[in-house]
Amino acid sequence: MAVLAAVTSPLEAQASAGSTEWDASARAGYAFLGRLCDDFGGRLVGSRQNRRALERLAEELSALGLKPEFQTFTMPGWERRVDSVTMLSPLNRSLRVAALSYSNPHSPFRADVVDIGKGAAADYPSGAKGKVGLLSAGTGLQTSEVVAIAKDHGLRAILFINREAGGQLLTRTGSFTGKALPLPVYSITQEEGLWIGRLLARGEAVRVEVRTTSRCVDVETANLVVRLAGRSPDKVIVGGHFDSWDLGQGAIDNGLGVAQLFALAHALRDRPLARTVEIVWFNGEEMGLWGSRHAAKVLGADPVIAMVNLDMVGVPIAINALGDDSLVPALERFQAGREVKLPKGVENVNWMGSDHTSYQLAGIRAVTFNAPIDREAVRYYHDFADTIDKLPERIVVDSTAIIADAVLSLVNDPGLRPFRRDAKETDDLFSRFGIDRRMKATGLWPTH
């Protein structure tokens, strides 16, 4: 689910770690991901493909002598079925769309389309009730905010224009709370969305027929956990989400993280560790961080140094303390000890919407990386073309070398102690970086 701040660096320009002790493990992780993508396709949480793929992961980890544990939980799920939006006038045309999750079945209906701009109340024209809203790709509102305003104005559906050209869609969650949406929301290609917008701007009536059969359904799923015991029970948690959207193979988002975690487990399985390392493949991240929310909850009072989140992490150019000032000195020690420095060193900028957020809400410090992925690969995330051929082995090899070094730095640093923020400090973590409004809009926060 991660949206990267920098995605335009060509692969050739990304930092290379060179040949390292981690290479064989990284190549094993990449090979595993290739089998996972080609054997099972997309890993939508709750689907048969997701379950079978997770079982395969457990089998291959067990073959390495590890003891993976299924951490089972129930969550509000969603099942994609056959949905359609058909233009009836001025032309008859089946539009390329994909429903956002938590869109629910309804009787087919026909309605005119109205341009609602960026989805704010002030953008609505008069007479929108009973129509289908065309939403700009440039909206800064959370989906929950867009839907609430649309409901107040009596819309029957929303067509959300994709930000990428080339006939792409952007599947995404419609709700972080797991509640069924009061009206269906569809991603529509940029080309067809802009076309409809031009027709409306000329005063042409655009009428569509909407059919939604996808449905909300509770699902039982699981995270997969590997614990590598250290001399101390203090733990460093390293996690990334296992699930993906269903249109493609989920190779970039987040098969990349799946491979990096596999490589880490492969590399550390026989290594003496000062602290315990807990490696977690989370399920249900794309629907609303459900797996990491469960994992953070069942941690209880376990002593945790930090959580490291691997969500679409290319080759790191910086390591990020995600707003926790107390982590910065340790990360600076990691950077100082590197023979090849990370070009942008240590950053300390918080953002929300991936699994680290769940741990931050539990008061646990989190770390991730500034790690750009080539635009010609990352542009396809959440769509049909997010496939293994977009991910060169070299990215997994070079990124794993840096990630593994960073994890071991956290494991071995004597200056670190387990730490939990209190609720006020957590509130400040979100407000200080201006993400408090978005956190509230998703329903993830406040928790007290």
State what each model feature region is:
Residues A17-D23, D38-R48, V113-I116, L134-L141, ...:
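Second-shell loop/turn segments in exported
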Residues D23, G34, D38-V132, L141:
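Noncatalytic luminal/extracellular "stalk/propeptide" segments of secretory-pathway proteins
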Residues L61-S62, A137, A150, I158, ...:
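Alpha-helical metal-binding/catalytic segments enriched in His/Glu/Asp
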